[in-house]
Amino acid sequence: VFGMRSCDATGLAFLERFFAGRSFEDDSVLARIRASLRMTMACDHPGPDCFCVCCDGGPWLTEGFDLQFADFGSRLLVDVGTGKGAAAVAAAPMLFQAAEPEAIEERARRLAEVDARFERRSYVAAGTKRISLGQVPIEKWEQWAEDCQCCGGCCFVCPTCSCFTVND
């Protein structure tokens, strides 16, 4: 899968953990996920409502990718994250060359700039952080459960969630 954003790759990792769960395992889904080569694009322009920092999903990944590309205009800087990524680079040596030290410095500078621009105060980010830290009172969950239509819409909004009934 080429070009998925950091948040998408993180969502895929959450789904992989779900489908390899304690009480349910979907071998077909797991085989497809694990056979994929995850080539992500580092995010230079997170949106105002993005919440990838709340689930360690970016804007640039440190894990969960095989190859991660950073767009430097006329060239791409590639980080290798796994053995599968290293094998892909080795299989196409004409497409890759070692990064110059200046490119590594540029990547660090850009990452700091992107991190500084990130909207950490978005209501989605604040809510996600409260949920992940266990700061939502049980009464609130009970209230939401009463209103829940079991449509799964929340799962379409956030791939880190898997709050649905699995029937086969």
Regions found by a protein language model. Give the residues of each.
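Iron-sulfur-associated redox domains of electron-transfer enzymes in respiratory
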Residues: V1-G134, I138-W141, P159
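Active/binding-pocket-proximal capping segment
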Residues: S162-D168
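Cysteine-centered iron-sulfur cluster-binding motifs in ferredoxin-type domains/subunits
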Residues: E142-C161
